[in-house]
Amino acid sequence: MQNLIRRFLFQYWYFGQPPWDTGVSPPELLDFIQNHEPGRAIDIGCGTGTNAITLATAGWKVTGADFAPRAIKLARQKVNNAGVQIELLVRDATRLQGIDGPFDLAFDLGCFHGIVPQGRAKYLQQLNRILAPGGFWLMYGFLKTEPDESGTGLAEWEVDQILTFLSLIWRRDGFDKGDRSSAWFLFQKPEELVEI
């Protein structure tokens, strides 16, 4: 029931201006683009497509996925106006059915941290399935300051769980606009496949 309510709220937010939809790509993504050759990228939880458009404009072949149909509708309008080619799909990040890799980059600006804990393992299985060996996962998320804290955010033990199949290239801790603890992570999948 809680998951259904969250889905409704996300869909509803896209009838206005969601607080996370700034229309500006973050410097972490821009730095990544500047320092890596274009390849295939997936924007998981792409919203209205701002970051997918940034990637496509830089030469990446991009797929954007979001579970909110309204977000994908708005993204299609923005993509059309930008004159770029992006595959946009209404998909749940814990399933990603019909999306095949390999992707050189999976980008996630606040999607993973909002998934209910029991869905995160499914998300990570999908990520492992679609990410190319040597591929990157650039992810932003809120952090939990207490191990048993409820709500949106990642606990340190969850970051440790990710490290069982991805290598941490860098981590940048900080605070969001509301002074909530958050971090950017750049993970890389090893060249040899790891089962999770």
Positions of predicted regions on the chain:
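Short catalytic micro-motifs in class I SAM-dependent methyltransferases
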Residues: 110-114
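A conserved beta-strand element that flanks and buttresses the S-adenosyl-L-methionine
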Residues: 107
